[in-house]
A protein has these predicted regions:
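Conserved C-terminal structural/oligomerization subdomain of aldehyde/semialdehyde dehydrogenase
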Residues: 69-180
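ALDH superfamily catalytic-core signature
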Residues: 1-78, 130
C-alpha cells in the first residue's frame, strides 16, 4: 500500500470529526508493513493529541502507546483515542472486525486489487471503503440527502414487512486516497 496515502486516510478518518459515527475507532496493520507504517501514522496523529491503545506488537513499535484492554477493541471512543492492532493476514483482520466492528463502516488501504475485492466481500458492514476515508459515509455524500442516522443492523423495521423492508444495502466505495 501507499503508506503516505494510508497515513492521510487514517488521519482524516480519525481527526476530522472524531465524535462522528463515521470516524474510525481502530486500525489493523499487516505485520509486514507495521514497523514502517505505525511510526508515520503516530507522527500525524500526535499533531492532534490522539491517544493510541495497542496490542503488544503495536506497543513495541510505538513508544508511548498504551496497552489495549480486551474491551478497547469493542469501544466506540468518539474522541481522540484509537485502538491499533498488528495482524498477520487479511483473514485475521476480517475475523477481528467480525468480532469487534459495529457493522457501519470499514476500510482498507491497499494496492492489491484482489485483496481489496476479497476484503469487500468478507467485510460485514453497511459501507466498505477501499483507499478512501470512512468519513464519506454520509447520506449527503452518497446522494441520499440528509440522514436521520446510520444503521449497522441488517433488519431495522417494525410493523408490516414488505420485500423492500427485507433488503439491506452494502455500499462499496473505491478511491485513490480521497479524504473528506
Amino acid at each position: 500500500a501507499d503508506l503516505s496515502m494510508a497515513v492521510r486516510i487514517v488521519d482524516n478518518a480519525k481527526t476530522s470529526a472524531p465524535e462522528a459515527v463515521n470516524s474510525i475507532e481502530s486500525v489493523l496493520v499487516h505485520r509486514d508493513r507495521a514497523a514502517e507504517f505505525l511510526p508515520k501514522m503516530k507522527q500525524a496523529l500526535d499533531l492532534h493529541g490522539v491517544r493510541i491503545l495497542g496490542c503488544p506488537d503495536t506497543c513495541r513499535i510505538l513508544p508511548g502507546a498504551s496497552p489495549a484492554a480486551a474491551e478497547d477493541w469493542n469501544e466506540d471512543f468518539r474522541g481522540y483515542t484509537l485502538a491499533v492492532r498488528v495482524v498477520d493476514s487479511l483473514e485475521e483482520a476480517c475475523a477481528h472486525m467480525e468480532s469487534h466492528c459495529g457493522g457501519v463502516a470499514v476500510g482498507i488501504v491497499t494496492n492489491d486489487i484482489a485483496a481489496a475485492q476479497r476484503f469487500a466481500g468478507m467485510a460485514d458492514a453497511a459501507a466498505v471503503f477501499v483507499n478512501a476515508s470512512t468519513r464519506f459515509l454520509d447520506g449527503g455524500e452518497f446522494g441520499l440527502g440528509a440522514e436521520l442516522g446510520v444503521a449497522g443492523q441488517k433488519l431495522h423495521v417494525r410493523g408490516p414487512i414488505g420485500l423492500h423492508a427485507l433488503t439491506t444495502m452494502k455500499y462499496i466505495v473505491t478511491g485513490s486516497g480521497q479524504i473528506r
